[in-house]
Amino acid sequence: MNIEIYTDGACSKNPGPGGWAYIMVNKDSKEEICRENGGEKSTTNNRMELMAVIRALKKIKEGAASLADKSGKALDYKSISVHTDSQYVQQGISSWIFNWKKNNWKTASKQPVKNQDLWQELDSLSASIKPEWIWVKGHAGNPLNEACDRLAVEACQKMM
């Protein structure tokens, strides 16, 4: 089975109340496997974007046995793709992170990397799961991206 994960984050006032969400689907059958959302009282949009991906990959890492399709068969995946509308997440994990690690978690301008705690957690999860990272244009009619956006906004509103 091939898994697609759609993620999104939302924040009001940045920093302010925020929400994250993910939807996991079987790419082959298009069947939804699971969805989850949550939030924080004081955060940023970038932290929520990162948290969405981290929570989804943690769900995978918890064990495929905890994820089953509707037939009850445990999840046995061949590949995972993460779809995000956040250039920050997609570029960060696919490109920038290599220099950040090489430079002791400093940016090219020698400043500490923002959200280092989450980037380190995502780096560890990504190294073991090895997902493909795909950027999708937000608010462009992709049904799963739009659904994820609604879930993240809903979680954000609950934090207000």
Swiss-Prot record:
The keyword Metal-binding applies. Its main location: cytoplasm. Residues 1-157 form the RNase H type-1 domain. Keywords: Cytoplasm, Endonuclease, Hydrolase, Magnesium, Metal-binding, Nuclease. It catalyses: Endonucleolytic cleavage to 5'-phosphomonoester. Mg(2+) 1 binds at residues 8, 49, 85. It is an enzyme of class 3 (hydrolase). Gene3D superfamilies: Ribonuclease H-like superfamily/Ribonuclease H. Its EC number is 3.1.26.4. GO terms for molecular function: magnesium ion binding; nucleic acid binding; RNA-DNA hybrid ribonuclease activity. Endonuclease that specifically degrades the RNA of RNA-DNA hybrids. This is Ribonuclease H. It comes from Treponema denticola (strain ATCC 35405 / DSM 14222 / CIP 103919 / JCM 8153 / KCTC 15104).
